[in-house]
């Protein structure tokens, strides 16, 4: 087997536009695992959102990576092997920046997600992710975080597609090098502590399974997947990926055409 570990993004890579996962991809994952390969999903989603979807893939053991690499959990037990997050002062600063500009913002702990706005965009988010968001009313998100002493894992802003990159640049300029600003879709901007990108997942799995990075493959579609793919030995991008990711990876079929299955065949040396 050429690559003994295979890390895959979820939305836009495994999950098609209609929210489903193809049987071809499911079969390819099962075959790769049956041959001795370790397959792990690495997503920006929270654990409560991704764990139920793993059952669709027939994955009932192993590890799953959530929150852009900040959290690693045991699939069978839900036990946390890694759970990093913000210093509270940093989380408050980021939330104040977003709320001062009137953005639709989310703040995540390892178990829950809170939002400052109840609207159609939030309803759509809940449907896609399969989670119930806690609406904060009568106070700012930053005030709730401070009052309850929340340990924040991730902060997100929902935006119109044409506002995504401008907000990313604004946050990068305002926050500096101590934070990681990225995007996981055309309407989401996400902020993590510096060093908590999906590249951290490659390093974690390499150490956990005692497999060198040269024998780890990764695939994705969005800018938040670039660090993971760049860190891996086998670099893949689905055909619908962002140009920045395609530039550093071997491009396979799109998510709608079972690109993950194609990459898994290559990873297995077929």
Residue ranges, per PLM feature:
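Conserved acidic, metal-coordinating active-site core of Asp-based
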Residues: 97, 101-104, 108-219, 223, ...
């Amino acid at each position: 087997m050429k690559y003994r570990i295979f890390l895959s993004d979820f939305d836009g890579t495994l999950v098609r536009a209609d929210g489903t996962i193809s049987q071809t991809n499911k079969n390819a994952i099962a075959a790769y695992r049956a041959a001795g390969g370790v397959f792990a999903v690495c997503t920006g989603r929270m654990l409560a959102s991704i764990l139920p979807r793993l059952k669709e893939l027939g994955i009932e053991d192993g590890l799953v990576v959530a929150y852009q690499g900040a959290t690693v959990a045991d699939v069978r037990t839900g036990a946390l092997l890694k759970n990093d997050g913000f210093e509270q002062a940093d989380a408050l600063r980021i939330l104040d920046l977003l709320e001062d500009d009137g953005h639709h913002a989310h703040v995540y702990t390892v178990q829950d997600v809170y939002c400052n706005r109840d609207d159609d965009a939030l309803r759509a988010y809940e449907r896609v992710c399969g989670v119930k968001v806690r609406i904060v009313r009568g106070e700012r998100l930053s005030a709730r975080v401070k009052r309850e002493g929340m340990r924040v894992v991730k902060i997100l802003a929902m935006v119109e597609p044409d506002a995504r990159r401008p907000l990313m640049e604004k946050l990068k300029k305002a926050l500096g090098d101590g934070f990681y600003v990225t995007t996981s879709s055309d309407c989401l901007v996400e902020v993590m502590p510096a060093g908590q990108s999906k590249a951290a997942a490659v390093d974690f799995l390499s150490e956990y399974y005692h497999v060198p990075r040269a024998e780890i493959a990764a695939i994705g579609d969005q800018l938040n997947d670039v660090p993971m793919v760049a860190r891996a030995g086998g670099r893949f991008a689905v055909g619908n990926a962002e140009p920045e990711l395609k530039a550093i990876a071997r491009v396979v079929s799109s998510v709608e055409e079972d690109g993950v299955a194609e990459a898994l065949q290559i990873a297995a040396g077929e």
